[in-house]
Amino acid sequence: MHRRLKILLTNDDGISAKGMSLLVANLLKADFADLYIVAPATEQSGKSMSFSYTQPVSIEKVDYPQPVAGAWAVSGSPVDCVKLALGDLFRNALPDLVLSGINHGSNAGRNIFYSGTAGAAMEAILSGVPSIAFSQEQHISFFQEVHAPEILKKLSLYALSMPFPILSGFNVNFPASERNEEWKGMRLVTTGKEYACGMPKLLVDDGKRKFFSLSDCQIVMDEDISDECRTLLENYITVVPLLVRNSPLALISETKFQQLQEAFDNFISSASGATLLD
């Protein structure tokens, strides 16, 4: 008999977000884990790894519209959610894995440094639990559910197949196809150099104070685009390692990364990763 996994779900778009609902729905279809949600009560995008250092946060058990094992809403950031889940709710029996997302928009390239979705995953990793951050390019409506249960299961099992902390987490971005073409597959790549940039937009100037919006951002790309960006444009799912031996990915050699790519390709193309649950 295979052991069912215990998976903690979180995000930065809020517990009621469409991306969370899609993640839950497709994990339920895959049917290999018991799901627990601890997510922000409200939108927390752009929070990175910030946490509520100077003020208390609350956590409340809520009824979730899908059949999960339990769900809680937190008044703080994505990192607050992970801290409360691992340090209080599940401190006596930690989850096997933390999945964060599915984010409404890209977290490819340097956007990862702003991302609350990725911040939650990093907090889990630093706390000793493997984690994956998921994001959908452009808009959550581009997410394709046809093969999603299999993809989510394989990525989860792959994350657990690596001896912690040799390779302890991933940042995954799903491509957006303008013609709704099916994803071509998955590729392990390094973080791209592209980033979101925009000028502050003045909303109100009352003579004493000015109010700005910082949300008007566009992706900045060089002519020499990164492997991550090119892979997404070619309609492949990108899988980027977050930490290798608790060190930034940039510190490992090209040869070592090629070995990681080969191991990833072999695992994903194998018939099943079910033996990991024995």
From Swiss-Prot:
SUPFAM superfamilies: SurE-like. Its cofactor is a divalent metal cation. Its main location: cytoplasm. The keyword Metal-binding applies. It is an enzyme of class 3 (hydrolase). Its EC number is 3.1.3.5. One of its GO terms (cellular component) is cytoplasm. It catalyses: a ribonucleoside 5'-phosphate + H2O = a ribonucleoside + phosphate. InterPro entries: SurE (IPR030048), SurE-like_Pase/nucleotidase (IPR002828), SurE-like_sf (IPR036523). A divalent metal cation binds at residues 12-13, 45, 103. The keyword Ribonucleoprotein does not apply. Binds 1 divalent metal cation per subunit. GO terms for molecular function: 3'-nucleotidase activity; 5'-nucleotidase activity; exopolyphosphatase activity; metal ion binding; nucleotide binding. Pfam families: SurE. Keywords: Cytoplasm, Hydrolase, Metal-binding, Nucleotide-binding. It is found in: Cytoplasm. Belongs to the SurE nucleotidase family. Nucleotidase that shows phosphatase activity on nucleoside 5'-monophosphates. This is 5'-nucleotidase SurE. The lineage of its organism: Bacteria, Pseudomonadati, Chlamydiota, Chlamydiia, Chlamydiales. The gene is surE.
